A protein has these predicted regions:
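Active-site helical microenvironments for divalent-metal-assisted chemistry
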Residues: 7, 132-135, 148, 152
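Acidic/His-rich, divalent-metal-binding segments that scaffold phosphate/diphosphate chemistry
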Residues: 1-68, 124
Length: 184
């Protein structure tokens, strides 16, 4: 099932999601919802409910995994499946590394949430380049093999950005302004 907003927020409480991760998830949801609404106007058949729930739940396991060392996207998928949220489990599972992305393919809810997550640093809208710099500084500084993985991941994200914005009436650098103007 696709969880309602109420269920998403109750699960955030149940899994003790810290306030800073909630703010991040809510900003990811705003971006993903704006992009989804605009893509639907352009004729794409995306589910706004699935995008909203997937964006809100994408980091459901982050604080747990900081303690246990587990991979938060995998643990998050497991949490979704345990709570019968199978329709968003793949979104949560692939919000860090997108599997089977085809640049020429139809855009999916999973790709929209993945992209939106890469545009938010903490709870602030940033460019992909700024987010990349932050991730390299935070995660790759001490673990050399992570730099190549992060760079590959962001190459996919740049392709995805081109695909998304080729269908929209504004540019990636205008995202924060469009969010403000439209009251997101």
């Amino acid at each position: 099932m696709i969880p309602s907003l109420d269920i998403c927020f109750r699960l955030m409480d149940t899994y003790e999601m810290p306030e800073n991760i909630r703010r991040h998830s809510m900003m990811v949801e705003r971006i993903a919802s704006l992009i989804t609404r605009r893509l639907r106007k352009a004729g794409l058949g995306l589910s706004p409910e699935k995008v909203t729930a997937g964006a809100l739940m994408h980091d459901i396991a982050k604080s747990l995994c900081l303690k246990t060392g587990e991979v938060h996207s995998v643990k998050g998928r497991d949490i979704c499946l345990q709570n019968h949220l199978d329709e968003i489990a793949d979104i949560v599972a692939e919000h860090v590394v997108l599997n089977n992305h085809r640049p020429e393919g139809q855009l999916t809810e999973k790709e929209i949430v993945y992209y939106a997550d890469k545009r938010v640093n903490h709870d602030i809208v940033v460019s992909l380049e700024d987010r990349l710099r932050y991730l390299l500084e935070r995660y790759a500084k001490e673990v050399a093999h992570l730099e190549a993985a992060i760079m590959r991941n962001f190459q996919v994200c740049k392709e995805l950005e081109r695909s998304i914005f080729s269908k929209l009436d504004f540019k990636p650098e205008d995202l924060a302004g469009v969010l403000r103007r439209e009251g997101y």
